[in-house]
Amino acid sequence: MQKKQYWNVKTLVFMALLIAMHLVLTRVLVIDLGAYRISVGSVCTILAGLWLGPVAGGVCGLCADIIGCFMKGYAVNPFITVAAILWGVLPALAKPLFANRKKTGKTVGICVSIVVTAILSSLIFTTAGLVIMLGYNLYAIMPGRLVQFAIMSPISGELTCLLYFSPLTAMVVGNVAPAVLKKKTV
C-alpha cells in the first residue's frame, strides 16, 4: 500500500515564491502589445514543474494566472488559464524522458519540451482564447504570434536551462530534510 504524499512547507514556500516571481515577470516587467505579450514569466512555471512535479507546476500556473487577472483587472479566460497550467505540467511530464541523461541530453530535452509546450500553450490555447473570448481576428494576429513564438521559445529555453543547471536546483530539490507539519492531539 502506498503512503499518501502531502506537500510540505518547503514545497509550498517555493511554489509561492515562483508564483510571485511569475506575477512580477508577467504583470510588471512586461511588454504588453494587445494580442502580444513579451515576458519571461512562464520560466517560473516551467521550473516549478521541473523542480516540484507536474501537479505543483500546474497549480503554480493556475494560481499565477488567476491572481494576475485580478491584478490587471481582466476576466479569467479559460483558454489562457489552461495554457498557463500547461506551462507547468508538460515540461514536468517530459522530465522522465531526459532525467537520466547527461547535461547535453537534459538541455535538449528541456528545450524540446519548451518548444512543444509553447506550440500547445501559446500558439493554440492562448490564440484560441484571444480569438474566441476577446474577438481578435485569427488571420490578423497569427503572424505576430508566430514571431513571438520564434523569439520567446529560445529565450525561455535558455533561461530555464541556465536556472535548472544552477546550484539553485540542488537547493530546491536537494536532500535537505524539509520541515514537516504534524498534527498534534491535545
Regions found by a protein language model. Name each.
Residues M1-V186:
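Loop-helix junctions at membrane interfaces
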